[in-house]
Amino acid sequence: MSNQHALLISNLLPVGSNISTWWNFGSMLLTCLMLQVLTGFFLAIHYTANINLAFSSVVHITRDVPCGWIMQNTHAIGASLFFICIYIHIARGLYYGLYLNKNVWLSGVTLLMTLMATAFFGYVLPWGQMSFWAATVITNLLTAIPYLGVAVTTWLWGGFSINDPTLTRFFALHFILPFIIISLSSIHIILLHNEGSNNPLGTNSDIDKIPFHPYHSYKDLMTTTSMIILLFIILSFSPDLLNDPENFSKANPLVTPQHIKPEWYFLFAYGILRSIPNKLGGTLALLMSILILTLPPFTHTFYIRPMTFRPLSQTLFWTLIATFVMITWTATKPVEPPFITISQLTSIFYFSFFIMNPLLSWTENKIMMQT
């Protein structure tokens, strides 16, 4: 494998000539990761992992530290852009059948779960009102584990409730996990370039390849620059656009927010969790909302990879995207009719995609055989 990679580098990484802009999100994600590690380091210098000082230390960073407000807001907005890019990256993989490269896809799902854990721990650190209560609700789900649940939850909390030890270990985990993400990203990229990138047509890229640099590197640079410009526009004109208003108040265990919810990029999973009126069932559904992404590599039934020439599969795919948006929207609403019913229906549609897609692909095979 090492010899192969030496050849790839010496040949300036030959890739298919027809890969589109949808293939640019990998480089955008790498840029986001570098940005998050850099800004996170400077924030960690001034942050204090103590329940009495955490909120004040974040206020100190934004008010007193030179350029601190830029670091803090860039880190917060960067997290949102990170998840926008990763969700588009996953959607691209589903649409173009890139999951058939099993090793790359499964390493990507592992990366996604690590990233979500990192983002969750980071959301708790400012010790705002919504941070505290979201952490209480989500970590309390561990009590649903049979026999071991209470012991695991107590161990994670470092006591019988979320307190100072919890914040300290969450800070430690949030600090160390990005380095694990960097390692997993390296594995993801090595596995990808071991077999080579696919293309929008799903054909063999070996027929027509060009050097990655300068042809695709400049294309990557354009989308990455556009993303950074978008980040600076939000940072300059509406830095609190993606923040929860409740987090501008210090955590108070005696006052429960009217509607507890995590950051917007977790709302689809939270919406699926809320749609099931059972703690264990909801927790399993929450886990399956991510783990079900491991299914497509083993259930692909169509004889070509992408959905480019499959109108029925395309319709189902865009239904999944609409469902994802709808679940996210319902999760922002109170647990009352009609949002309960909408949430339950959209959750069923979400999981149905992964069952219906192989069946529909099989049907499309039959139709195409007859024509």
UniProtKB/Swiss-Prot annotation:
Heme b b566 binds at H89, H188. Heme b b562 binds at H75, H174. Heme 1 (or BL or b562) is low-potential and absorbs at about 562 nm, and heme 2 (or BH or b566) is high-potential and absorbs at about 566 nm. The chain crosses the membrane at residues 25-45, 69-90, 105-125, 170-190, 218-238, 280-300, 312-332, 339-358. This is Cytochrome b. It is found in: Mitochondrion inner membrane. The keyword GTP-binding does not apply. It comes from the Eukaryota. The cytochrome bc1 complex contains 3 respiratory subunits (MT-CYB, CYC1 and UQCRFS1), 2 core proteins (UQCRC1 and UQCRC2) and probably 6 low-molecular weight proteins. The gene is MT-CYB. One of its GO terms (molecular function) is metal ion binding. It is a multi-pass membrane protein. Component of the ubiquinol-cytochrome c reductase complex (complex III or cytochrome b-c1 complex) that is part of the mitochondrial respiratory chain. The b-c1 complex mediates electron transfer from ubiquinol to cytochrome c. Contributes to the generation of a proton gradient across the mitochondrial membrane that is then used for ATP synthesis.
